[in-house]
């Protein structure tokens, strides 16, 4: 499905004991072409948005919060095809920066990623803080654990709706940026309330 094996021996590799959690959050700036960002925003507005849902792995159920829930929709095959090589490029950059290249048997962090889900934040909407233990990715045929989280940002003409980690570590993403971080319990994150405009983004998880 995907190939993240474009590894290079990078002297700036950060897989070292002194690396902090914050150091492992990486942004590829402007990696998505502006015209593709504009096309995605226009294309998604032609289709139905639905309230975001949370998956309960114990009860095997989905549900939305009563207020402030963002809007979501799945990618079409056509948009997925356009975004796939860009996601692979971003993932390869992360791989190169953080993989322990001296390992004889395992030099690749991930092999596949999910279909992109599009997110829309209108004024008053948020993403509640959570961690990316995405049980619903795996149905028995695909086996693994989510390893890396990706957020793709498609516009910057909005206020608020900023990605944050922990209490107040905030990332202001530009148009065409992709931000990545490990999908585990050490990275609680959410999105602040949108104030004006609409923020359009996409998410995918690699394993």
Q: Model regions: which residues?
A:
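Fe(II)/2-oxoglutarate oxygenase catalytic core
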Residues: 1-178, 186-207
């Amino acid at each position: 499905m995907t190939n993240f094996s474009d590894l290079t021996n990078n002297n700036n590799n950060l897989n070292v004991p002194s690396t902090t959690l914050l150091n492992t959050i990486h942004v590829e700036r402007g990696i998505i072409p502006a015209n593709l960002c504009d096309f995605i925003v226009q294309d998604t507005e032609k289709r139905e948005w639905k309230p975001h849902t949370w998956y309960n792995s114990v009860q095997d159920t989905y549900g939305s919060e009563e207020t402030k829930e963002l809007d979501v929709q799945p990618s079409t095959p056509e948009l997925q095809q356009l975004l796939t090589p860009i996601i692979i490029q971003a993932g390869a950059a992360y791989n190169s920066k953080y993989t322990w290249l001296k390992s004889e048997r395992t030099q690749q962090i991930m092999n596949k990623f999910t279909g992109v889900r599009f997110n829309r934040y209108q004024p008053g909407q948020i993403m509640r803080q959570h961690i990316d233990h995405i049980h619903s990715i795996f149905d028995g045929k695909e086996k693994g654990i989510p390893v890396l989280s990706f957020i793709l940002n498609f516009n910057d003409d909005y206020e608020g709706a900023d990605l944050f980690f922990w209490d107040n570590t905030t990332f202001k993403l530009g148009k065409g940026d992709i931000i990545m971080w490990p999908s585990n319990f050490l990275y609680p994150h959410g999105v602040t309330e949108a104030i004006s405009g609409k923020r359009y983004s996409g998410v995918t998880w690699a394993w």
